[in-house]
Curated annotation (Swiss-Prot):
The gene is ispH. GO terms for biological process: dimethylallyl diphosphate biosynthetic process; isopentenyl diphosphate biosynthetic process, methylerythritol 4-phosphate pathway; terpenoid biosynthetic process. Catalyzes the conversion of 1-hydroxy-2-methyl-2-(E)-butenyl 4-diphosphate (HMBPP) into a mixture of isopentenyl diphosphate (IPP) and dimethylallyl diphosphate (DMAPP). Acts in the terminal step of the DOXP/MEP pathway for isoprenoid precursor biosynthesis. It comes from the Bacteria. HAMAP family: IspH. CDD domains: lytB_ispH. Dimethylallyl diphosphate binds at residues 96, 185, 317-319, 379. This is 4-hydroxy-3-methylbut-2-enyl diphosphate reductase. It comes from Rippkaea orientalis (strain PCC 8801 / RF-1). The active site is at 187 (proton donor).
Length: 403
């Protein structure tokens, strides 16, 4: 399928909307009332630091809602205002924070049900309004909705669209797209649907395995088993890794994406030589500015003398998970929570360690004066960050009173 032509045709349809409905200002006003925080604004104005009692808070200098998320949420609010009585659906979570998605449900924006791992589009009727989330949607989903006569509101982040353009360039030149991402993540599912031949690699370890195979060969069956569900139909590692282009899920760790790109470039140089490297390797910068800014801000924050970190964001948020990796790798105790209710009485916290399920940690706040680093993922509203900070202040105040 010519995905580029389909996308162009869809965007020219009168049922397709990507720029809102002229009610953005009103939608943003409602959003600001619900999600902004006066405390967080004060902390920003105070050089991202705040002291209360024996707690000093250091906020990362880039955190929380990115402009792509703000745009997606505003468009969802605007859609409900513009279509007050129509059935409105969304193909996935709009963004990866439960509070925002719960608010959309309160506005009677319905999420498409997933049955046995597959989305059930049977309830969607012609004339229904369907929102595509910030992560985008696959070509097959867009085609189904268009054929059904739905009104499509596309909130796909422009940075995600930029990656789609990159893999389409790979496809046009018959390059295999090496996508750094999580193959089940909504964004990577969408990106791979625009690619021709593709392989999704999760991390540097998997990328190294692929590059070793390119240089030395190996067991094809083992390769295909290792990357099951992470490659295009008919993918053959013996023939489809001669020309590769690099792409990424925009929320992956910037430094790892860059390492993977350099690894593949070096591998193709070794195998084919510098004279023809451009016939075997392509790379475009598709690292999202907002993701990069938040990771860079976290790298600066962990240079401070912190007693611990709190990273706030949805547990299924890829960009939040990668923020959590930074202090952990620096040896700083860090807790990933999604909202303030995870901070329990008696100095306990329910948090999600990297790669594990939720667990309870007792005595998580040290006694005496402490310095706490705080950041949040790109889908987390400031009001959630405020609630977490207030909970920390309250916990330390209770400690002071009991002593």
């Amino acid at each position: 399928m010519d995905t580029k032509a389909f996308k162009r045709s869809l965007q020219q349809s009168e049922n397709y909307h990507r720029k809102g409905f002229g009610q953005t200002e009103a939608a943003m006003g409602v959003m600001n009332t619900e999600y902004q925080s006066s405390l967080i604004q004060q902390i920003r104005q105070n050089n991202y630091q705040w002291k209360q009692g024996n707690v000093t808070i250091h906020l990362a200098q880039a955190f929380g809602f990115c402009w792509g998320v703000e745009r997606a949420v505003a468009m969802a609010y605007e859609t409900r205002q513009h279509f007050p009585k129509e059935s409105i659906w969304i193909t996935n979570e709009l963004i990866h924070h439960p509070s925002v998605n719960q608010r959309l449900e309160q506005m009677e924006i319905k999420f498409i049900e997933v049955i046995n791992g597959q989305k059930d589009f049977s309830q969607i009727k012609s004339g229904d309004v369907v929102i595509l989330p910030a992560f985008g949607a696959s070509v097959s989903e867009m085609q189904l909705l268009n054929d059904r006569g739905c009104t499509i509101v596309d909130t796909t982040c422009p940075w995600v669209s930029k990656v789609w353009n990159s893999v389409e360039k790979h496809k046009k030149r018959h390059y295999t797209s090496i996508i750094h991402g999580k193959y089940r993540h909504e964004e990577t599912v969408a990106t791979s649907s625009f690619a021709g031949t593709y392989l999704v690699v999760l991390n540097l370890e998997q990328a190294t395995y692929v590059c070793d195979y390119i240089l030395k060969g190996g067991n094809k069956e083992e390769f295909l088993a290792k990357f099951k569900n992470a490659y295009s139909e008919g993918f053959d590692p013996d023939t489809d890794l001669e020309k590769v282009g690099i792409a990424n899920q925009t929320t992956m760790l910037k430094s790892e994406t860059e390492q993977i790109g350099k690894l593949f470039e070096g591998t193709m140089l070794k195998k084919y030589g510098p004279a023809v490297i451009n016939d075997h390797f392509m790379s475009f910068n598709t690292i999202c500015d907002a993701t990069q800014e938040r990771q860079d801000a976290m790298l600066e924050l962990v240079k401070e003398k912190l007693d611990l970190m709190v990273v706030i964001g949805g547990f299924n948020s890829s960009n939040t998970t990668h923020l959590q990796e930074i202090p952990i790798y620096q040896g700083i105790t860090s807790y990933h929570i999604d909202n303030a209710t995870r901070i329990k009485p008696n100095n306990c916290i329910e948090h999600k360690p990297l790669g594990k399920d939720l667990e309870i940690k007792e005595n998580w706040l040290p006694e005496g004066s402490i310095v706490v680093g705080i950041t949040s993922g790109a889908s987390t509203p400031d009001i959630i960050v405020e609630a977490v900070i207030e909970k920390i202040f309250s916990a330390k105040e209770l400690e002071y009173q009991s002593n």
